[in-house]
């Protein structure tokens, strides 16, 4: 088994990439065969997440999925989660919350930490909760795509994740923005309506703004704060 402790780049499996959908299903099938219940999907319920959930359900209909509930998300995001639960009732969808409430965080670190120290806010409300959710897991799935941003251009299907000392599985690395939307429309999948209002990438409400450029689909995240990642995908 490929784990963080036994990682050997020469042992990584290869997958067909002539068809993105089949390729993603091959990656997911390998991952669930390889890790079974030791595999977790950390989903933001953005448009890539909607695609991955549909693909995962074809491979493992009772897969474990975690949403990092920072208590700062848009109402539309929570509504999307409820619709997904109804559409895929066997999936085990869990909302992982931070140990600090927003009031406790403000008391300890000051008001609007997402403005004064966004990295600390992401650490408290995303990174630490994901560590807790991944306790005992050997691998996790992410919806990263190479096209999303310059920091993601070298992501592979199977990655050594030094931050979480885990294996990170990324089935959608070769998918384009258009590929994602073609799949959504072809399968008539329900998605977050904020995508239709100029939000290609959706995170916490205070740190997410519309981004009307396909050149950088994440330009609406942490705008003006010199930050493009929450820290989950940084080594």
UniProtKB/Swiss-Prot annotation:
Its cofactor is [4Fe-4S] cluster. [4Fe-4S] cluster binds at residues 121-122, 204, 207. Keywords: Cytoplasm, Iron, Iron-sulfur, Metal-binding, Oxidoreductase. Signal peptide: none annotated. Transmembrane segments: none annotated. CDD domains: PAPS_reductase (cd23945). Pathway: Sulfur metabolism; hydrogen sulfide biosynthesis; sulfite from sulfate. It comes from the Bacteria. It holds the Pfam family PAPS_reduct. InterPro entries: APS_reductase, PAPS/APS_Rdtase, PAPS_reduct_dom, Rossmann-like_a/b/a_fold. Gene3D superfamilies: HUPs. One of its GO terms (cellular component) is cytoplasm. Its EC number is 1.8.4.10. GO terms for biological process: cysteine biosynthetic process; hydrogen sulfide biosynthetic process; sulfate assimilation, phosphoadenylyl sulfate reduction by phosphoadenylyl-sulfate reductase (thioredoxin). The active site is at residue 230. It is found in: Cytoplasm. Binds 1 [4Fe-4S] cluster per subunit. It catalyses: [thioredoxin]-disulfide + sulfite + AMP + 2 H(+) = adenosine 5'-phosphosulfate + [thioredoxin]-dithiol. One of its GO terms (molecular function) is 4 iron, 4 sulfur cluster binding. Belongs to the PAPS reductase family. CysH subfamily. Catalyzes the formation of sulfite from adenosine 5'-phosphosulfate (APS) using thioredoxin as an electron donor. This is Adenosine 5'-phosphosulfate reductase. It comes from Anoxybacillus flavithermus (strain DSM 21510 / WK1).
């Amino acid at each position: 088994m490929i784990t963080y402790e036994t990682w050997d780049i020469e042992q990584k499996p290869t997958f067909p990439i002539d068809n993105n959908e089949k390729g993603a299903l091959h990656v997911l099938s390998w991952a669930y065969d390889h890790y079974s219940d030791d595999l977790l999907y950390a989903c933001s319920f953005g448009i890539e997440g909607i695609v991955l959930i549909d693909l995962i359900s074809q491979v493992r209909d009772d897969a474990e999925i975690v949403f990092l509930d920072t208590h700062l998300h848009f109402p539309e995001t929570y509504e999307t989660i409820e619709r997904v639960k109804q559409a895929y009732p066997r999936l085990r969808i869990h909302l992982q919350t931070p140990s600090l409430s927003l009031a406790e965080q403000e008391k300890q670190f000051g008001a609007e930490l997402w403005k004064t120290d966004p990295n600390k806010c992401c650490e408290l409300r995303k990174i630490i909760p994901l560590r807790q959710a991944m306790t005992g897991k050997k691998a996790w799935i992410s919806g990263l795509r190479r096209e999303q941003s310059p920091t993601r251009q070298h992501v592979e299907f199977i990655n050594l994740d030094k931050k979480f000392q885990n294996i990170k599985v990324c089935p959608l690395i070769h998918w384009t923005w258009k590929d994602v939307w073609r799949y959504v429309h072809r399968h008539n999948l329900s998605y977050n309506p904020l995508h239709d209002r100029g939000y290609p990438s959706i995170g916490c409400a205070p740190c997410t703004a519309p981004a009307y450029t396909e050149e950088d689909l994440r330009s609406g995240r942490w705008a003006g704060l010199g930050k493009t990642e929450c820290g989950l995908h940084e080594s």
